[in-house]
Amino acid sequence: MRKNNFYFLVVIIFINFFLLPVQSDDMFDLGKDVFLNKAVCSTCHTLADAGSNSQIGPNLNEIRPDKMTVMNTVANGIGVMPAYEDQLTPEEIEAVAHYVFTSAAN
């Protein structure tokens, strides 16, 4: 019986981590749209999920920033990157942070 429970648990974990698509949530979709179309982050940043391969800004796949770092950087800017707090809503900033964090982590 314990062996069956263990196998059941392994199957559930496998389904959650490998079979459920990352892109299924609305925040992810909004963040991807902001990344590609509204803030046009792909102009400067490399992110595999977005199909962007720019060399101007940091490669987000390599640095894998956490959500708070992305939110802060998008809102306030850093270095030559402009601030977007006047162009994006708080929801869009959170969504693009979620998208970058989720995509770069995979």
Kindly give the residue locations of the regions a language model identified.
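C-terminal capping alpha-helices of c-type cytochrome domains
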Residues: 87-106
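Gly/Gly-Pro-rich "capping" loops immediately C-terminal to redox-active cysteine motifs
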Residues: 32-33, 42-78
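Surface-exposed patches in mature extracellular/periplasmic domains of secreted proteins
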Residues: 43, 84-85
